[in-house]
């Protein structure tokens, strides 16, 4: 949904193989050298599929092999500009799960490379965006072509698709 968050349960699982007699979960988590990784796409090749699924929530029924098709589309589909950012490793002597979640989430928001598509989605949803906040990167797609991707969607699906693209801008502005 464009609102990427660290799942605390996954971090807790990483601490399960510790020697419970000699190591605390916080010590183990601190030693793992977790590196926050942020991948920013100008275009999500699965945006329409995700929007349909998210718009209908629990009432959505997947077609046979839809997950496999989504994976293939995600790998092979056009993404436009892609930015991969490796953050600073989390290697404190002791690191609690809530602190790790907060550090990783903050790094993802700070290191996300906003694209013009993110700002176009905000505009389409009625958000006022300061000119100084806009992405400086050249777009590999025009604004009209980007918005046309959602022409065949229902209003609820279109809203969901635009929110997926707008969410990184909203998260970044909220963190300031």
Describe the residue ranges of each PLM region:
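Membrane-interfacial terminal anchoring regions of lipid-handling membrane enzymes
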Residues: 1-176
């Amino acid at each position: 949904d464009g609102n990427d968050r660290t799942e605390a349960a996954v971090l807790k699982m990483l601490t399960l193989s510790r020697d419970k007699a000699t190591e605390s979960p916080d010590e183990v988590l601190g030693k793992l050298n977790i590196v926050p990784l942020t991948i920013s796409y100008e275009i999500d090749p699965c945006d329409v599929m995700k929007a349909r699924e998210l718009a209908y929530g629990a009432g959505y029924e997947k077609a046979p092999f839809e997950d496999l098709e989504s994976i293939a589309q995600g790998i092979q589909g056009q993404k436009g500009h892609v930015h991969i950012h490796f953050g600073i490793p989390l290697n404190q002597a002791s690191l609690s799960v809530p602190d790790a979640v907060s550090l990783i989430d903050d790094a993802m928001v700070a290191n996300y490379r906003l694209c013009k598509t993110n700002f176009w989605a905000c505009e389409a949803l009625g958000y006022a965006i300061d000119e100084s906040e806009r992405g400086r990167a050249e777009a590999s797609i025009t604004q009209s072509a980007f918005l046309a991707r959602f022409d065949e969607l229902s209003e609820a699906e279109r809203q969901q698709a635009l929110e997926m693209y707008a969410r990184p801008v909203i998260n970044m502005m909220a963190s300031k």
